[in-house]
A protein has these predicted regions:
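Hydrophobic alpha-helical transmembrane segments
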Residues: 1-269
Length: 269
């Protein structure tokens, strides 16, 4: 039976987070609703440490999305709607973590395996988002993860050295929040290895999937390269990747990679 005080705590905390998200426009209405549902699931399974890890991801990512936003927009690489994210983004980034949280509650014999999978999944998508937002501030050339050819800023599969600084920042924040706020005792060394590997490998897997699989289109009207299947009011022409395999699918690949890496570290280290 769920502790009624935990339910009350979760309701109050998520209500406060919802107001902050709405006031800062970090998520739109649908995105906020899905995020609250995900937060409730995590709160009642993994506990407050899991929710605080998700909140850290959302807050820091939203802040870095807005840093240098005009410059990002000028090169066509800024998040749409002023950086406000929707429900598909929430599911792409948080769906795997939600499944890991539920499995943590159901599988008594392998609870810590799923706890590490949860942490690794969130750390990976956090790292990927920071790699993008910090990397877009770089003045150096963007390189493709495969072949190292020159890429345009924001192009799927593009990487920068500064972007990997963002990965390290996300990993350290994930490590600190997990170590400080999870009620279950976590081995500091194993946790550090987990978040570093899950963050780095997850973000790299995102770049590989972005270059090989993510759909990239060319607008029939203006000729611009875009991730949108429709541009300037007309259907775009697919020039690379798998039709329909969008950024949210790539995010899910990143999240799943982080979860698998973290579970492997827990199992074998």
């Amino acid at each position: 039976m769920v502790d009624p005080w935990l339910l009350l705590e979760a309701a109050v905390f998520l209500a406060v987070v919802s107001v902050v998200v709405w006031r800062t426009r970090a998520l739109d209405a649908a995105g906020g609703a899905v995020a609250v549902l995900l937060g409730a699931v995590v709160y009642l399974t993994v506990g407050r440490g899991g929710v605080l890890l998700l909140v850290a991801f959302l807050a820091v990512s939203a802040a870095f999305t807005r840093i240098g936003y005009e410059r990002k927009r000028s090169v066509g690489a800024a998040e749409l709607k002023g950086g406000t994210r929707g429900w598909r983004n929430v599911l792409g980034n948080g769906g795997v973590a939600g499944v890991a949280a539920v499995m943590y509650a159901l599988e008594a014999s392998n609870r810590h395996l799923y706890l590490y999978a949860f942490i690794g999944s969130v750390a990976a998508v956090f790292a990927d988002t920071m790699a993008t937002e910090v990397g877009l501030l770089s003045r150096c050339r963007v390189r493709r993860i495969i072949g190292f050819g020159e890429a345009r800023p924001g192009e799927p599969g593009g990487v920068t050295a500064l972007g990997y600084v963002g990965v390290l920042m996300a990993a350290m924040i994930s490590y600190a929040v997990s170590l400080l706020f999870f009620t279950n005792p976590l081995d500091p060394v194993k946790l550090l290895v987990t978040v570093l590997l899950a963050s780095t490998i997850g973000a790299t897997a995102d770049s590989v999937a972005g270059q090989l699989l993510q759909s990239l289109y060319r607008c029939r009207v203006c000729g611009a390269l875009t991730e949108l299947p429709n541009h300037c009011g007309e259907p775009s022409v697919l020039v690379r990747g798998v039709r329909g395999f969008d950024n949210q699918a790539v995010n899910a690949v990143c999240a799943l990679t982080g979860a698998v890496v973290a579970a492997a570290v827990y199992a074998f280290l």
